[in-house]
């Protein structure tokens, strides 16, 4: 009888593990939002002062504008850990992430753990630089809308 109890417990555990699996709910793709973002990125390409910077992953390019050049010429590598201030906004100005100077302490980031567009910018900056960057969806959170940890960060498209 004791043997059957263990078998029943093992089967229960198997079902529990299976039921705790990842519930990837299908996130609805917003085609209108996608088109609006692509149009805003294209329009930003025409704004004086912005330049294109290709990613090393060949996923595309970001747009950047140098607001301030820092004193240091020390390079930032893909494996670097950096402290930086930033503010992530949607094209309508809504803030989705704020680690700006006004918000308090800088974020401590590992470049390799950032979305491709952010990593591309950081690897071309130097300590003390201040840039405005525009990241296209394929180099940001893309159609998943998720961060590396899997949490939904932005509206996917």
Show where each model-derived region lies.
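Sec-dependent signal peptide hydrophobic core
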Residues: 5-13
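C-terminal motif of bacterial Sec signal peptides marking the signal peptidase cleavage site
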Residues: 15-19
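Cross-family detector of peptidyl-prolyl cis-trans isomerase
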Residues: 4-5, 20-157
């Amino acid at each position: 009888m004791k043997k059957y109890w263990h078998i029943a417990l093992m089967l229960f555990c198997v079902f529990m593990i299976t039921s705790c699996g990842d519930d990837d709910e299908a996130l609805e793709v917003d085609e209108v939002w996608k088109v609006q973002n692509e149009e805003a990125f294209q329009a930003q390409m025409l704004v004086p002062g912005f330049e294109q910077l290709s990613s090393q992953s060949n996923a595309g390019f970001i747009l950047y504008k140098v607001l301030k050049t820092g004193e240091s010429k020390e390079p930032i590598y893909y494996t670097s850990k950096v402290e930086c201030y930033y503010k992530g906004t949607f094209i309508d100005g809504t803030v989705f992430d704020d680690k700006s100077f006004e918000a308090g302490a800088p974020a401590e980031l590992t470049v390799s753990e950032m979305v491709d567009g952010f990593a591309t910018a950081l690897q071309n900056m130097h300590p003390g630089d201040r840039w405005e960057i525009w990241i296209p969806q394929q180099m940001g959170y893309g159609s998943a809308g998720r961060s590396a940890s899997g949490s939904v960060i932005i509206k996917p498209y």
